[in-house]
Structure formats: structure tokens, C-alpha cells
From Swiss-Prot:
Gene from which this protein is expressed: US27
Keywords from the UniProt entry: G-protein coupled receptor, Glycoprotein, Host cell membrane, Host membrane, Host-virus interaction, Inhibition of host chemokines by virus, Membrane, Receptor, Transducer, Transmembrane, Transmembrane helix, Viral immunoevasion, Virion
Listed name of the protein: G-protein coupled receptor homolog US27
Subcellular location: Virion; Host cell membrane
Stretch list, region Disordered: 341-362
């Protein structure tokens, strides 16, 4: 009786603890939405690659720890954006062997990038907090070498935290089913859901809300308003994270309560599965549009990304200047350089903060 109950629990939980789109219905849905998925993949890939290229190419000399965290956050979003359509296309063309690969691959991409992105967001908020509140006192501690070390640690931590979600699952009966022992099949799925709720949602939001509140109070009381734009960008990033991941985490929380209470209702189960799929879709949309938030809100980021885009566009398209116009072009270039030098001197003279304080987030 215990074995059958555990098997029933495992069957009921298989859809819940699998938080990526792996069921047969999703493969069929991909047939109808393939164009939209690939369009979002192209847009998300372009925006995330543009962010990464801007940080590595345009800002390589004045890169800050915040830029390092944003770059790796874009890498995590890029893995989610690229992973979904390619895994589903592979499943379409190799139906016999690919379901196992898709089951493990999608779970690995989803959870590793989830935990890594959370770590980078937390460090981004803490870095902004240190810059605004502590300022020069932490310049020796706050450097790119330490940020790179933290990035490596966070990626390793994300792989370890996501390991149960892709190593303990296999494709069985058209579903990505968790292979748990009979002794752990009742409580281990609840543990996984709770871990995602706390480590992947509640704790990061609480920490980022605390640091944001402290930064706002410090700026209002002690600093000028020129730092507020950094907080605007950070606030939009945090709010988008909380909004887009809320349905997914709510479904996990409801499923944990359902398992602990021992309630097995088909209607409730279908509602939770639907919420999980909606949450997964919103997470995918957020990974595609997250760089757009930087472009729309961050003035400095928008300028740097636009400059990078123009540089690479000019490299791809050769502009030939007629021989008789070379002197004119040289004179125009000298005038532009002189004008830029005067403007830079004026900006530095009247800047409210040092030029080294200017961050990619602004």
C-alpha cells in the first residue's frame, strides 16, 4: 500500500517538480508557436549579445564590478533564450533519443541560470549599496578581480544548487519524471520547491528591497539627486524580477501545500500546471527583454550600447571618401575633436561626482 501511494505521489508530482516545458502538449504547442519562439529568441539573443559586447569591448578600460555582474547576468539570460528553441527543435527531429536530452538539458539551463541570475542581481544591488553609502572607504575591496572571483563562485554554486533538478529526472511516459527513492518521494519534491521559493525568490527580493530602502534614505538625507537614476534602473530590474517570477513561485508554493496536505484534485493540479507554464513563459520573456530595461531606463547604458552598435556597423560597411573631400573631412574631424575636448573639460569641471564613479547602469 505504501509503495502504491508513493508511486501515485510521484506521478502526481512529476508535472509539478518539472519546471520546464517538457510534456507532449508543449511539444505540440511549439509546432504552432515556433515562429514566435524563434522571433523572441532572435531579439533576446541580439539584445543580450549587445550588452555583453558593450561591456567587454566599449567599457573594457573603465569596467566596474557592476558591469561584471550585468555581463554575467546577460550570459545567464542568453542561455535561457537560446536553450529553449534549440532543445525543442532537437526533440522534433530526433524524437526517440532526444526526449531524455531535452528533459535534462532544459532543466539544467533553467535552474542553473535561475540561481546564477539571482546571485548576480544580489551582488549588483550590494555593489550599488557599497558605492552610494560607503563610497571611497570600500574602493580597496571593490575591484574587478574580486568581482571576477565572486562570479566564478556564483556559477559553481548555481551548478550545485540546480544539480538535483536535472540529474534526478528522466523522460518516462512523455513526462519529465523525478526518480526519487521511496523514502524520499513524499518530502523531497516539497524540499526542492521550498528551496526555489526561498533561495530563488523570497530571500533575494527581501535583501534587494532592504538595500534599496537604505540607499534611498541615504541619498535623500546626505547625497544629491544625481544618484537617483542608478536607483531607478535598479528598481526597474528588481520589480521586473519580482513580477515575472511571481506566478512560477506561487505555483510551486501551492503545489507544496497540496502535497503536504495530501490533496489530489485534478482541477487543482491542472490549475497549478497552467500557472507553472505561464511562469515559465514569463521567465523566458524576461530573459529576452531584460536588456531592453537597461536601454529604456539607463541613459549611460543606452549611449554606450548605441556607440558599440555604430562601431560594429561601420566595421561591416566600408565608407570610401573621395580624394578631393579628404581635407574637408579632416577639418571636420579636428573641429569635432576640439568641440568634444571643450565639452569634456566642462563636464568634468561641473560634474557632481568623479568620472570614475560613472557606472554602466546609469
Amino acid at each position: 500500500m505504501t509503495t502504491s501511494t508513493n508511486n501515485q505521489t510521484l506521478t502526481q508530482v512529476s508535472n509539478m517538480t518539472n519546471h520546464t516545458l517538457n510534456s507532449t502538449e508543449i511539444y505540440q504547442l511549439f509546432e504552432y508557436t515556433r515562429l514566435g519562439v524563434w522571433l523572441m529568441c532572435i531579439v533576446g539573443t541580439f539584445l543580450n549579445v549587445l550588452v555583453i559586447t558593450t561591456i567587454l569591448y566599449y567599457r573594457r578600460k573603465k569596467k566596474s564590478p557592476s558591469d561584471t555582474y550585468i555581463c554575467n547576468l546577460a550570459v545567464a539570460d542568453l542561455l535561457i533564450v537560446v536553450g529553449l528553441p534549440f532543445f525543442l527543435e532537437y526533440a522534433k527531429h530526433h524524437p526517440k533519443l532526444s526526449r531524455e536530452v531535452v528533459c535534462s538539458g532544459l532543466n539544467a539551463c533553467f535552474y542553473i541560470c535561475l540561481f546564477a541570475g539571482v546571485c548576480f542581481l544580489i551582488n549588483l544591488s550590494m555593489d550599488r549599496y557599497c558605492v552610494i553609502v560607503w563610497g571611497v572607504e570600500l574602493n580597496r575591496v571593490r575591484n574587478n578581480k574580486r568581482a571576477t572571483c565572486w562570479v566564478v563562485i556564483f556559477w559553481i554554486l548555481a551548478v550545485l544548487m540546480g544539480m538535483p533538478h536535472y540529474l534526478m529526472y528522466s523522460h518516462t511516459n512523455n513526462e519529465c519524471v523525478g526518480e526519487f527513492a521511496n523514502e524520499t518521494s513524499g518530502w523531497f519534491p516539497v524540499f526542492l520547491n521550498t528551496k526555489v521559493n526561498i533561495c530563488g525568490y523570497l530571500a533575494p527580493i527581501a535583501l534587494m528591497a532592504y538595500t534599496y530602502n537604505r540607499m534611498v534614505r541615504f541619498i535623500i538625507n546626505y547625497v544629491g539627486k544625481w544618484h537617483m537614476q542608478t536607483l531607478h534602473v535598479l528598481l526597474v530590474v528588481v520589480v521586473s524580477f519580482a513580477s515575472f517570477w511571481f506566478p512560477f513561485n506561487l505555483a510551486l508554493f501551492l503545489e507544496s501545500i497540496r502535497l503536504l496536505a495530501g490533496v489530489y484534485n485534478d482541477t487543482l493540479q491542472n490549475v497549478i500546471i497552467f500557472c507553472l507554464y505561464v511562469g515559465q513563459f514569463l521567465a523566458y520573456v524576461r530573459a529576452c527583454l531584460n536588456p531592453g530595461i537597461y536601454i529604456l531606463v539607463g541613459t549611460q547604458m543606452r549611449k554606450d550600447m548605441w556607440t558599440t552598435l555604430r562601431v560594429f556597423a561601420c566595421c561591416c560597411v566600408k565608407q570610401e571618401i573621395p580624394y578631393q573631400d579628404i581635407d574637408i573631412e579632416l577639418q571636420k574631424d579636428i573641429q569635432r575633436r576640439a568641440k568634444h575636448t571643450k565639452r569634456t573639460h566642462y563636464d568634468r569641471k561641473n560634474a557632481p561626482m568623479e568620472s570614475g564613479e560613472e557606472e554602466f547602469l546609469l
